[in-house]
Amino acid sequence: TARARQIPALAKVMTGELADSVLQGELFLRRDGHVQQQAGGMNARAKVAGLMMRADAAAALSQLDVFIWAWPDGPSDMRRRQKLLAQAGFKYSGQYTHPVSSIEQVAQWRQRWYRSPLPFVSDGVIVREGREPPGRVWSPGKGEWLAAWKYPPASRVMQVRAIRFSTGRSGRLNVVAELEPQRLDDKRVQRVNVGSVSRWQMLDIGVGDQLQISLAGQGIPRVDAVVWRTAERHKPTPPPAKFNALTCYFATPECSEQFLSRLIWLSSKSALNVDGVGENLWRVIQQQNPMTHIFSWLALTVEQLQAVPGISAARGQHLWHQFDLVRKRPFIRWVLAMGIPVPQGALAQLESENWHLLAAKSEAQWRTLPGVGEIRARQLVAFLHHPDVVALAQWLSGQRIPGF
């Protein structure tokens, strides 16, 4: 990209064996003696992304460098590969790549880099075999010839301020512990999802208790342990469970939480992948333009979106454009957005289906799909014939959504 060409650390021209090569790596923010164990992540990746998006960042881009961690179809000899990369200006890969022959050696390097000054922020080590498959068969997340070994997660003892209950998109009651806010690595943590009511009761968490909190994948806080409990227990009574996987497709006052959870899900990457739309935006849209059902936003006009508090004219136009683009998503994405209980392994076999074909399937036909047993087949038939789901399918048909 044009912005990448402004980064001084990136060579403008590659010659020799590197000419026309594809390199894989990551931009990083140069640090002076960064000790991961002490300083944590420092939100470094977000800072890099911010610099790459700034219009006036030409000078600041000199703070960036690149770590090349793969050269598909490059020289098979690792020493020669690292030498060629270093000659081209990619010095860090060679400095931080070492041969190992045992898990003990891997552990030693991991501990050393975790506790020693480095010129960048890191979150673990990559262990890879000496040989790699041809580049044409590489697939993200599916390389059996390499593995990541993350550093121990940062953790803190944090006190519980309150316990509250929320309803997820499946209708299940979730327990959230509100915490005294603290910095954990590069994040400000003030709440943690405990999980189901049964898990909360098993952990016996009350107001005033102290929890060991760490960051799981993607920086999500998690409860590792209860380290101290108050002598006098303060635990609220959970509300009665009155929602399920087929409730709250339509908005009502008592459905507000599950309805919002459904909106958050359908806009996520796992469903319709609506760019730039999340929980906060759904809240303000629902307050300004109350939606009847989970797909009512498709009928919003540019003017209605621009009238939402906090949304500028330009952003309103952009949102309307994103909503309009979603109309072209494949049929399977729409039924996922509705919450169809299909196992991941069976999705590929539904890509050529439409709503009428799905609704016509019997329990016996559903059981022929991977991962679908007697209970799941019964759930699928119930889902496809539920009056609210049928009404949504009819509405989407009126909107000319593919497959309906």
What are these regions (language model features)?
Residues 357-365:
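Extended, well-ordered alpha-helical scaffold/bundle regions in very large, multi-domain proteins
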Residues 346, 353-355:
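Extracellular/lumenal glycan-associated surfaces
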Residues 1-329, 336-342, 351, 366-399, ...:
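RNA/tRNA-interacting regions in translation and RNA-turnover enzymes
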